[in-house]
Amino acid sequence: MKKTAKHFCPHCQKEVSWQDNPHRPFCSERCKMIDLGSWFSENYKIPGEKKPSEDEDDN
């Protein structure tokens, strides 16, 4: 018997079928687009050193 892992949508936490899901890891196109909008709005950020602005480079 093959075990299947449970997967959950990163946005709404609904259980998601992984196989044949064109939106994975999301449950739907809606959750996928909400997540993309959060990246575009800079609600999500990857930690790292702050990049100096162009004005600071002139010194």
UniProtKB/Swiss-Prot annotation:
Binds 1 zinc ion. Its cofactor is Zn(2+). Gene3D superfamilies: Erythroid Transcription Factor GATA-1, subunit A (3.30.50.10). Disulfide bonds: none annotated. InterPro entries: DNA_gyrase_inhibitor_YacG, Znf_NHR/GATA. One of its GO terms (biological process) is regulation of DNA-templated transcription. Coiled coil: none annotated. GO terms for molecular function: zinc ion binding. Pfam families: YacG. Keywords: Metal-binding, Zinc. PANTHER family: DNA GYRASE INHIBITOR YACG (PTHR36150:SF1). Belongs to the DNA gyrase inhibitor YacG family. Inhibits all the catalytic activities of DNA gyrase by preventing its interaction with DNA. Acts by binding directly to the C-terminal domain of GyrB, which probably disrupts DNA binding by the gyrase. Interacts with GyrB. This is DNA gyrase inhibitor YacG.
